[in-house]
């Protein structure tokens, strides 16, 4: 009899816990209902500890704003950068002339001049320096809540507690920003690109 009561209590407890847990897809759907319109977010996906946002906004391609050349960007940031110029091959593309800006802490940004856009385009990067601020105000060292508040209006905080990586991907899936959290702080921002240069 005691075993039967114990089994019934265990099953009832599992049912309550299961009902309290919200599936990843349900979380993603709820988060979609709270997106900020200026980011033109078209989809949100959650897989284990990673949330991926797909957006049509050009802020993913131009996270530091739209610049006609590197010198204007360097002057505007008022930060001390070391600058390397060279050629790099990305994926199966031809080699491209790349400007690499570096900070003393190891942060770097690879950029190139887009001949079709006439603007500086992002290729690669890792930002850990808290002084490097994206156009939308994001920077390393911010709280997780502040980062999510940039992309979403009010939402259940419990939905992002277990998120350790936030990926913001351009609609064409060519450029992305990867925000990696350690605890409740933004540890670093990564920039990835799958551009084809032709």
Give a label for each model feature.
Residues 1-4, 20:
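Positively charged n-region of N-terminal signal peptides that target proteins for export
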Residues 18-160, 182-198:
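Short helix/turn-capping signatures at newly exposed starts of structured segments
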């Amino acid at each position: 009899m005691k075993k039967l009561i114990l089994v019934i209590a265990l099953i009832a407890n599992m049912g309550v816990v299961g009902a309290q847990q919200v599936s990843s897809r349900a979380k993603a759907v709820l988060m979609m209902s709270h997106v900020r319109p200026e980011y033109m977010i078209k989809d949100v996906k959650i897989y284990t500890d990673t949330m991926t946002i797909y957006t049509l906004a050009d802020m993913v391609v131009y996270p530091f704003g739209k610049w006609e050349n590197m010198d204007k960007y360097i002057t505007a940031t008022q930060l001390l950068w070391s600058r390397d110029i060279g050629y790099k091959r990305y994926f199966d593309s031809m080699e491209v002339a790349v400007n690499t800006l570096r900070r003393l802490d190891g942060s770097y940004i690879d950029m190139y001049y887009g001949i079709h856009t006439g603007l500086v385009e992002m290729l690669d990067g890792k930002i850990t320096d808290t002084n490097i601020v994206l156009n939308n105000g994001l920077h390393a060292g911010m709280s997780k809540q502040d980062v999510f508040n940039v992309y979403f209006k009010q939402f259940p905080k419990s939905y992002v507690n277990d998120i350790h990586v936030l990926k913001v991907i351009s609609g064409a899936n060519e450029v992305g920003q990867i925000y990696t959290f350690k605890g409740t702080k933004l540890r670093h921002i990564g920039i990835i690109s799958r551009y084809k240069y032709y």
